């Protein structure tokens, strides 16, 4: 019962008035449990955990304001309409009235979730922050089959496939991809869009088997919401780079199973604004330009629109656009590094490599890519190809002008941000370990061997930039100057440290001699007193060590005593975590040692 | 996962749980000095158990549903009129088949648009003449809404003409070939079907013909290569999904406004509806 209804003799206050159990909430809303679950998912309502559970610990509690929030939503009425419509159809079929059933099925009640997206994400950045789960779910369903038993519809799977390809095309076009990692579950990607890091997981391009342990109703409700969300985000992102949305693909490329390439081609051709832009976008731009002035006359608006349409006829319009895009892109050094990683490289993908993933990654880092089959931009016999990605034990024909590498080389180059040497990735060879870019090795305390190698290669690549002062780029000059300053400072610090160490050593030696109270002349004179002196020295050293340990322990105890109980517990938790981490690192080192010893044994 | 939730809340719950674990572990170590015992919250264990119970019940419920559907067909009373009608339908189908073979002249297989044919069994009557039933079994189209890839030869086209009222076929494009094999393909190895979730099984079955991965299989089927027969026999018939609104599936030929027979390139639209 809500709080506002108070029958005589029954008052509710405190948690009893604030929280409501699930059964009572379902009764209050007068919908079924399945519809209640669906509504909670769409509106973002989740159970609460009150400290005092009025009706027992075993029940699920919802906040009363959340339930009122659901009660006032138009969706609840729409769901009731859908239920009534389904009953009507069932009744018509039962009465063998096929005409009525067909008429009812032709006009089903539908609903849209656009209002919910605007309600839950007031600004665009809020939507981008919540995009990880959305992208993972959409990419998962794009790879699932439409099986008869489940309620996964064919149209929904096609929609997910289209949305995922559109998202990948945008990331590839704007060079926003930052990290990739191949795992057993699938391929992880991380992109940076408008300052937000977005990470998602794509299943491998193999068949997915649906298990019966999964409740697809809940997943389909989430998917319904996420499809709408990704549609909105794609719309806004595409318009931010002056491309029409939804895109119109080349039907020939679509028929040849090359949707991602068709999307990239569409984005390249659709770059020019002007006639292709809708009028609303022009008005939006006008609004942005005239923020200062509170009034806008019709004549001024018309004149501005004409001025905007004018540059499409001038020859310098494209140069202006290029300059604008260059200026905008110059802000982000990370994006600049990513866009030029694979520049001037030309890739050809063999049939057996994961084509969709590499078609997404290689253009995102500035490379040119082709594959086997119709609709590909160039053929295998092109002499300009620099790398061919293969994963097959034998090759039909080997061209001497290119390198044959395994697909892992691409992912490792992307994570290292440099072109790695290809010796380790040649066909037929076991590639180096594929390291996760999401792990911070310094924080973990264990740096794998290959990570060390990559660091060295990165340092070498950085040092190659130093002897190029002739470039006129300001960013390059600044980075060069900073590099020089850092190098000189580090040299000075190293020198100072070395001197200090030498001085400290001398001081320690002199102190020890003074403590012993002996000189070289005394030592040479007597032999038997030397033995006695040595034993005395040992005892003295032991005493010194004991005193040192005691001093350290006393200091620690004093500091612990000064802490409060909460701080002491926190310190103990921190120590336990550090101990656990050390154990993990030791386990890794032990494994590595065992692997090395077994490898050497095999070598014999 | 039964209730997938945004990862932020999961992370928050994990953090809270971790803190609880750490606190209790610290207390135990402070008191007893023994090794830390594993700790999982009671509600988490309950939720896990409920999920497992739900999975078991769900499996049983689905099996019972399938059994019930299978039992519905048994025990039905058939009247003599049904037998008579069935026999007459068989005879009529046979006569129509012979007439169709006599009247219709097939163009040579080389003049067709493509060498690859995808045939789908459409819903139809149970009253099949034994001759047609035998040919459908040879084409492996014994179940409704299943499909197979075939090579467009004169013999194959003649067989398809014989069973035309019960199938529809056409020339698929590369996109649909790829979609069908990637999503619905099932291999047949050691007298047992298995899903194509790994390249090792494909290499084990077809490695001697140079087909070592899923993409090789797609290429062989799409281009009708020299080992098309082995590749096609390796793939089980594809089970397609019934659309929301049931197709009318009239027995008239497609060019006459029905649903059976040769659709040529329009088969792609149908495949996109069913896959």
Swiss-Prot record, chain A:
<comment type="similarity">
    <text>Belongs to the pescadillo family.</text>
</comment>
<keyword id="KW-0539">Nucleus</keyword>
<feature type="region of interest" description="Disordered">
    <location>
        <begin position="275"/>
        <end position="299"/>
    </location>
</feature>
<dbReference type="GO" id="GO:2000232">
    <property type="term" value="P:regulation of rRNA processing"/>
</dbReference>
<dbReference type="InterPro" id="IPR036420">
    <property type="entry name" value="BRCT_dom_sf"/>
</dbReference>
<dbReference type="GO" id="GO:0070545">
    <property type="term" value="C:PeBoW complex"/>
</dbReference>
<dbReference type="Pfam" id="PF16589">
    <property type="entry name" value="BRCT_2"/>
</dbReference>
<dbReference type="GO" id="GO:0000463">
    <property type="term" value="P:maturation of LSU-rRNA from tricistronic rRNA transcript (SSU-rRNA, 5.8S rRNA, LSU-rRNA)"/>
</dbReference>
<dbReference type="GO" id="GO:0005654">
    <property type="term" value="C:nucleoplasm"/>
</dbReference>
<dbReference type="InterPro" id="IPR010613">
    <property type="entry name" value="PES"/>
</dbReference>
<comment type="function">
    <text>Required for maturation of ribosomal RNAs and formation of the large ribosomal subunit.</text>
</comment>
<feature type="region of interest" description="Disordered">
    <location>
        <begin position="574"/>
        <end position="604"/>
    </location>
</feature>
<feature type="domain" description="BRCT">
    <location>
        <begin position="337"/>
        <end position="427"/>
    </location>
</feature>
<dbReference type="GO" id="GO:0043021">
    <property type="term" value="F:ribonucleoprotein complex binding"/>
</dbReference>
<dbReference type="InterPro" id="IPR001357">
    <property type="entry name" value="BRCT_dom"/>
</dbReference>
<dbReference type="GO" id="GO:0030687">
    <property type="term" value="C:preribosome, large subunit precursor"/>
</dbReference>
<dbReference type="GO" id="GO:0000466">
    <property type="term" value="P:maturation of 5.8S rRNA from tricistronic rRNA transcript (SSU-rRNA, 5.8S rRNA, LSU-rRNA)"/>
</dbReference>
<dbReference type="GO" id="GO:0003729">
    <property type="term" value="F:mRNA binding"/>
</dbReference>
<keyword id="KW-0690">Ribosome biogenesis</keyword>
<keyword id="KW-0698">rRNA processing</keyword>
<protein>
    <recommendedName>
        <fullName>Pescadillo homolog</fullName>
    </recommendedName>
</protein>
<dbReference type="GO" id="GO:0003723">
    <property type="term" value="F:RNA binding"/>
</dbReference>
<feature type="compositionally biased region" description="Basic and acidic residues">
    <location>
        <begin position="282"/>
        <end position="299"/>
    </location>
</feature>
<feature type="compositionally biased region" description="Basic and acidic residues">
    <location>
        <begin position="577"/>
        <end position="586"/>
    </location>
</feature>
<feature type="compositionally biased region" description="Basic and acidic residues">
    <location>
        <begin position="531"/>
        <end position="557"/>
    </location>
</feature>
<feature type="region of interest" description="Disordered">
    <location>
        <begin position="518"/>
        <end position="557"/>
    </location>
</feature>
<dbReference type="Pfam" id="PF06732">
    <property type="entry name" value="Pescadillo_N"/>
</dbReference>
